[in-house]
């Protein structure tokens, strides 16, 4: 059935298009002769650029329109950054493949400073991520953290124009766009714990579309799937969204999974951290247990306050 054209729903940003072309390349490498076309779309998250992401709220800020295209038959698969994928899917849709993960770390980007610790007091650092903001404020309460929206090119332009002394971006996005020279250094997980699924590309489709699911099966990277499964299980238990001060990062060491997580107050005044080590086969259960530990230690109250401040979530 290679005569059927597979339509990929994707956002129109340069990074999203890179991801869609990446999936196209993988599909055609595994299935020579397969015809593929891209269906570029604009999401709500792409349109509303003058408001912090946490204030815009809404589940699926960057994926809802793509999912609608799957449901009404305009597309066969949707390609997402895993960190943007909500904790629940519309009925009939699901995540069927997670590609091999790129570097999941955050990148410190600055025109004049080599390291976060080199920034003078009062320096302005740009990021709209509450996860990044709370960790920055804990480490450097003397900095001014300001929201920063737009695609990667827009954010770099604002840095270059002098609006910020530094900005925090994802290493994976910069590398994929050929902009790795802009990275001053990749921040360790101890310094900035990554977002759930950061650096991984996920593929969603209709669950009853057996043909497309068979085509996608070779694209799933088992090690990445286990790591992201643990991270997402933790996030689901916390009822976290994409725009909350939650970090989670799993590493595989042989058959052992090491899962770290944090929930932080946006002002950096409270940070609840935890970790688990166990068999990789128990990735999901580890995520649930770690979330329960964080909730019992005060994460519930922190998240309740965040949701009260950002009711649109």
Swiss-Prot record:
GO terms for molecular function: hydroxymethylbilane synthase activity. The modification S-(dipyrrolylmethanemethyl)cysteine is found at residue 242. GO terms for cellular component: cytoplasm. The keyword Transferase applies. This is Porphobilinogen deaminase. It is an enzyme of class 2 (transferase). NCBIfam families: hemC (TIGR00212). InterPro entries: HemC, Porphobilin_deaminase_cofac_BS, Porphobilin_deaminase_N, Porphobilinogen_deaminase_C, Porphobilinogen_deaminase_C_sf. Binds 1 dipyrromethane group covalently. PANTHER family: PORPHOBILINOGEN DEAMINASE (PTHR11557:SF0). Belongs to the HMBS family. Keywords: Porphyrin biosynthesis, Transferase. The porphobilinogen subunits are added to the dipyrromethane group. Its cofactor is dipyrromethane. Pathway: Porphyrin-containing compound metabolism; protoporphyrin-IX biosynthesis; coproporphyrinogen-III from 5-aminolevulinate: step 2/4. It comes from Yersinia pseudotuberculosis serotype IB (strain PB1/+). It catalyses: 4 porphobilinogen + H2O = hydroxymethylbilane + 4 NH4(+). Tetrapolymerization of the monopyrrole PBG into the hydroxymethylbilane pre-uroporphyrinogen in several discrete steps. Pfam families: Porphobil_deam, Porphobil_deamC. GO terms for biological process: protoporphyrinogen IX biosynthetic process. Its EC number is 2.5.1.61. Monomer.
């Amino acid at each position: 059935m290679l005569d059927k054209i597979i339509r990929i729903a994707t956002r129109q940003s340069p990074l999203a298009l890179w991801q869609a072309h990446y999936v196209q390349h993988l599909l055609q490498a595994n299935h020579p002769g397969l015809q593929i076309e891209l269906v570029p779309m604009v999401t709500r998250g792409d349109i509303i650029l003058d408001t912090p992401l946490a204030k815009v709220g809404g589940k699926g800020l960057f994926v809802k329109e793509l999912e609608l295209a799957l449901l009404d038959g305009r597309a066969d698969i949707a390609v997402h950054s895993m960190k943007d994928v909500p904790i629940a899917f519309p009925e009939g849709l699901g995540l069927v493949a997670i590609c091999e993960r790129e570097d999941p770390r955050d990148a410190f980007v600055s025109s004049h400073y080599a390291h976060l610790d080199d920034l003078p007091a009062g320096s302005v650092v740009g990021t709209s991520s509450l996860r990044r903001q709370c960790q920055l404020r804990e480490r450097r309460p003397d900095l001014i953290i300001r929201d920063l929206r737009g695609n990667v090119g827009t954010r770099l332009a604002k840095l270059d124009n002098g609006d910020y002394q530094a900005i925090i971006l994802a290493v994976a996005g910069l590398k994929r766009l050929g902009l790795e020279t802009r990275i001053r250094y990749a921040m360790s997980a101890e310094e900035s714990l990554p977002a759930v699924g950061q650096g991984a590309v996920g593929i969603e489709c209709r669950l009853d579309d057996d043909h497309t699911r068979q085509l996608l099966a070779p694209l799933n990277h088992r090690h990445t799937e286990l790591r992201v499964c643990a991270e997402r299980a933790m996030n689901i238990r916390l009822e976290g969204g994409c725009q909350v001060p939650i970090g989670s990062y799993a590493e595989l060491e042989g058959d052992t999974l090491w899962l770290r997580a944090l929930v932080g107050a946006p002002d950096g005044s409270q940070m609840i951290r935890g970790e688990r080590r166990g068999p990789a086969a128990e990735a999901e259960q580890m995520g649930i247990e770690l979330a329960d530990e964080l909730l019992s230690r005060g994460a519930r109250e922190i998240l309740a306050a965040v949701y009260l401040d950002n009711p649109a979530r």
